[in-house]
Regions:
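N-terminal glycine/serine-rich phosphate-binding loop of ATP-dependent small-molecule kinases
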Residues: 7-20, 24-105
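Gly/Thr-rich phosphate-binding beta-strand-loop-beta motif of the actin/hexokinase/Hsp70
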Residues: 25-44, 128, 134-157, 173
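Glycine-rich phosphate-binding loop of actin/hexokinase-like ATP-binding domains
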Residues: 49-51, 137-170, 228, 247-252
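Adenine-nucleotide phosphate-binding core of ATP-dependent small-molecule kinases
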Residues: 51, 188-227, 234, 245-246
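Conserved phosphate-binding catalytic cores of ATP/NTP-utilizing and phosphoryl-transfer enzymes
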Residues: 106-137, 254-259
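Glycine-rich phosphate-binding loop plus the immediately following alpha-helix
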Residues: 119, 124-133, 158-201
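Glycine-rich phosphate-binding/hydrolytic loop that grips phosphoryl groups
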Residues: 178, 205, 246-259
Length: 259
């Protein structure tokens, strides 16, 4: 009869929901940087949510666990490891990885000192290679430091360079001189400054743009089909200032970690 059929459908629906939730792979991706932590929740390859935290500890993570049925996770940090946090994640996730030099990767790492290689740098390289496999790639990450990572078409990470980031340069000029003020980035930057403040802004910002474009042009002499990714907290600031064609992806490191 109809009631029996309706009850049967409800039972089947409940079973399917339970089955789907049980085998649903919801990943917790944590990228802990020098000044903040980016956290994302992925359902397979789809990002369901993302957060940025200045303070990041067990209390913050536990609040995320209350909202999402997390089953897997990876934790990458460029600062000292928080043992309490790592233990909490390992105890509450079915499959947890703390990213270090012992973890197997989908790219070949030719860096001579893999233990000292920043995990954010490595994750960005993995993310770029995942999005554009079989291509020569340059990844520029504009944050506290600016990093340049080179991956060839065979999927080998060849190495990279590190230079001071925009905010770091502003602070250094103020810290290591007696009279130069501490300034911040502005939307409009002249080619040549007309006072001390704009001279610093123009020098720092235009200097970084020339640096980025210079690396791209030099590397394209050897890798003519080089593709360039730009990521990092300040990527939006340089995206439209570069004369070279790029792929801007603010979540590139998270994409790499989710691999």
């Amino acid at each position: 009869n109809f009631r029996g059929y309706a009850m049967f459908l409800r039972v089947i629906s409940s079973f399917l929901f339970f089955f789907a939730e049980k085998f649903r792979h919801v990943n917790l991706i944590i990228e802990q940087g020098n000044t903040s932590s980016k956290v994302a929740v992925y359902n397979k390859r789809h990002m369901e949510a993302s957060f940025v935290f200045k303070k990041f500890d067990v209390e913050v993570v536990s609040s995320i666990f209350k909202k999402y049925p997390l089953t897997k996770g990876i934790f990458s940090t460029v600062i000292d490891k928080d043992d309490e946090l790592v233990e909490y994640l390992g105890s509450n996730l079915r499959n947890f990885v703390f990213l270090d030099e012992t973890v197997s990767l989908p790219i070949k790492v030719q860096y001579k000192t893999p233990k000292t290689l920043g995990k954010d740098r490595l994750a960005a390289a993995v993310g770029a290679n995942y999005l554009q496999p079989g291509k020569d790639l340059l990844v520029i990450d504009a944050g506290t430091a600016i990093t340049y990572e080179l991956i060839d078409a065979s999927g080998s990470y060849l190495g990279g360079n590190i230079s001071p980031g925009m905010t770091t340069r502003f602070r250094a000029l103020n810290l290591f001189t007696e009279k130069l003020p501490l300034v911040v980035e502005q939307e409009y930057i002249p080619l040549v400054g007309t006072d001390t403040e704009t001279a610093i802004q123009a020098g720092v910002v235009n200097g970084i743009v020339c640096e980025m474009d210079g690396y791209i042009e030099m590397l394209r002499l050897k890798y003519p089909n080089l593709l360039v990714f730009l990521t990092g907290g300040h990527s939006f600031y340089f995206e439209r200032r570069l004369k070279n064609s790029i792929f801007a992806d603010i979540n590139l490191v998270l994409t790499g970690l989710n691999r």
